[in-house]
């Protein structure tokens, strides 16, 4: 199974999460703002920062470039200052393209996007990633 991990972050916490997800999956986590071309993939992990309940427009612009037949499944992880899940718009955009979404998104609460990931959250990220991998591997 081909797996890709991409993220959009202006802080440290989400980048840390993306790197952990990538490490577990055996791939490099790629910043959406870097020059790259996303190949077709079976499973895409997408990381996004949530600021004041909103996802940066750059994420939506990036996702608009996906041809609908290049990604089979996706899972979203995010960092939110208030701990709420604001990833619904991103999920809907991907489902509209015919991409199967993992039914639960991972939201990590962080009072600062520049803090360090706690051990509790680190374990949460690992468990989430392993659960998604099992679900998409059958």
Predicted region positions:
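FMN-binding flavodoxin-like domain, especially the glycine-rich phosphate-binding loop
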Residues: 3-4, 9, 13, 17-28, ...
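N-terminal short beta-loop-beta anion/metal-coordinating cradle
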Residues: 30-33
């Amino acid at each position: 199974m081909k797996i890709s991990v991409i993220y959009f972050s202006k802080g440290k916490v989400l980048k840390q999460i993306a790197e952990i997800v990538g490490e577990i999956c055996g791939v490099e986590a790629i910043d959406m703002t870097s020059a790259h071309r996303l190949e077709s993939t079976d499973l895409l992990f997408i990381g996004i920062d949530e600021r004041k309940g909103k996802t940066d427009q750059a994420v939506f612009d990036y996702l608009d470039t996906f041809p609908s037949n290049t990604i089979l499944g996706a899972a979203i992880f995010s960092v939110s200052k208030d701990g709420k899940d604001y990833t619904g718009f991103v999920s809907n955009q991907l489902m509209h393209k015919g991409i199967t979404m993992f039914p639960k998104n991972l939201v990590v609460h962080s009072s600062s996007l520049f803090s360090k990931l706690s051990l509790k959250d680190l374990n949460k990220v690992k468990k989430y990633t392993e659960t998604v991998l099992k679900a998409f591997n059958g």
